[in-house]
Amino acid sequence: MTIAQLTCESDTVANQEVLLSIITVVRNDAQRLLKTIDSLVEFYGDERFEHVVIDGKSSDQTLDLLQTNSRHKNFQYLSESDNGIYDGMNKGAGRASGQFLLFLNCGDRMAASPDQLDELLRPVAQTDEADIVCFCSRVYHGAHAGVLRPQSGRLHKMPTSHQAMVFSKEFMRTHLYDTRYRIAADFNLYLSANAARVLVLTGSEPLTDIEAVGVASENPWQSYKEYLQIAAEKLHGSTKWMALARIGCKAAAVILLKKTLPKGWLNALGRRA
């Protein structure tokens, strides 16, 4: 998918004032998708929001669930083969009509209410002060949860979880997820932004409830390999070398602790790379 295709697709969406498009990518995961859909009940029918689901041509009950949920006017889905998670996310961005985009993983849940989101995002939309807005998220390790607060000025890792980052539509018109990366394309996208236009809301309530287990935490070696490659390509000078050193040290620590820590703790380390 190209930038031109994304722009063209978004222009075909009905011209309406949608504040936030929530994008979910799924393939053969109906049970966890239902958790995400259930968390958005308050958002369905609210014209300030829309939910866009990109399905990778599922063969389970996912399509039945999507067809049932399509009764909501602000819900849409596309089911076709894709080239992985980030290709699906790019497709979702192309179909979205909101001023802001949130990529909510299948199985993760929205924690904020529609009015809370409106209160936080409306001023940003009116002032055009940010390309990326970073919120808190609540991370679940089984039955236990902890709040992950965003941090600014960190170039060796994500400022917060990807599911707690809201992107402006204008930013996504000119930046897509690089599908060369299987796990860390979100980190690549973050480093593509102007640091001065990344807004960090440290005092916010959690935007999303997310699972500690994910693609990155289940494949830490591939994750760190991609992080190192991206930092080497995107950063320069002393900033690059500091980032590479920190990523390398984190990777080494995970390797050493892999066989001694419970799986949930290792997943927590992998969540923030």
What spans do the regions from the language model cover?
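Glycine-rich, basic loop-to-helix element that forms the pyrophosphate-binding segment
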Residues: 78-96
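Short, acidic, metal-binding catalytic loop of nucleotide-sugar glycosyltransferases
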Residues: 38-48
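Cell-envelope/extracellular polymer assembly enzymes that use nucleotide-activated donors
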Residues: 18-21, 50, 188
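Short beta-strand/loop segment that forms part of the nucleotide-sugar
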Residues: 48-57, 78-81
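A conserved acidic beta->alpha catalytic loop
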Residues: 55-64, 105-107
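Short aromatic/hydrophobic "clamp" motif used to bind/position activated sugar donors
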Residues: 101
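Conserved nucleotide-sugar donor-binding catalytic segment
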Residues: 135, 142-230
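Conserved donor NDP-sugar-binding/catalytic core segment of glycosyltransferases
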Residues: 109-147
